[in-house]
């Protein structure tokens, strides 16, 4: 029995634990899981190993960090270090997107190294296997794709991206109308290239019932990939993106009927003014399914600083209802991220999530803001560091540029606004 099915009968211990952490009633949370409005990614064999994480309606915004090798840079030890660094700095989940080295061994090592849910994109592995046989990626058949999915589920991944919603109709829109950047989803491009080469419908769409059987057997959460996500703000909200969204909504219904948890992936590069509409449309078409967005990135001209751009878009998206933010690092569009990039990406995305939760009136966010305000009023620097999203950086600044008076900082010194006012109030007494 899957967790979704359990929640239709009772309140599982996993759900009770999440409810306590989130400050919601267990019965309400179980109902949302049963309805598909909240997902709890945890493979059937890993429920006791993975820290339970709820993603969706009424819960704090969660963040994901991507790690993984490439054909250019393949250091499994580094990827394990990156995964641990991401979790240490507050990532709620990790995805292994490896395309270089022993993919299965890397996946298993990352799953063993962290205690949060781990996701993957199996079609990458299917493509890599074809390349290693000296053949083109498009030479794979549907069995190659499905075997990769099955293998990842057998290995115990908690959630996986499956690009099942890109159909010939959506692909035709791209080919006929054109796009500034075509298809930028790596998994989406692999599937689309296969469809073009074989002049055939997406085998992941046509075999979705079989994928559901596998997911139900292992209780793996499906993350319905957005192959047609815009890679430029110029391509946002075009016909192809919307056609795929409609199919994602159809697949959400089929997942729920099968008792399989599902979330929906979204863009991508989207102008700031269009982000609220993107979220509202997804929530309507997909009947409240958890929304997992990459960014969104609201401008194309910030290479090297895309973690900042994505945090801006992510805060807007999350405030309007996105549930799950995939981090973007400073290396996005440029190179494989290193540990420092991963940390910066996680911190930027945590800021976006906290800003959104503050605006949404989440109690934990208000409490943390109140505690920080109190620490600042008291000029309690150690407490401020404890409350900071990243305690190390503010402590470093203060130690590197110390003030003359211990209770002040080197920005204002004796002209500190708080101290001036407090002294005046004390004198008045």
UniProtKB/Swiss-Prot annotation:
Question: In terms of domain of life, where is this protein from?
Answer: Archaea
Q: Molecular function (GO) terms listed?
A: 4 iron, 4 sulfur cluster binding; carbon-carbon lyase activity; zinc ion binding
Binding-site list for substrate? 66, 95, 124, 163, 185-187, 226-229, 265, 292
Where is Zn(2+) bound in this sequence? 269, 333
Note whether Zinc occurs among the keywords. yes
* Residues annotated for [4Fe-4S] cluster binding in this entry: 409, 412, 416
Under which name does UniProt file this protein?
Phosphomethylpyrimidine synthase
Q: Which organism is it from?
A: Methanopyrus kandleri (strain AV19 / DSM 6324 / JCM 9639 / NBRC 100938)
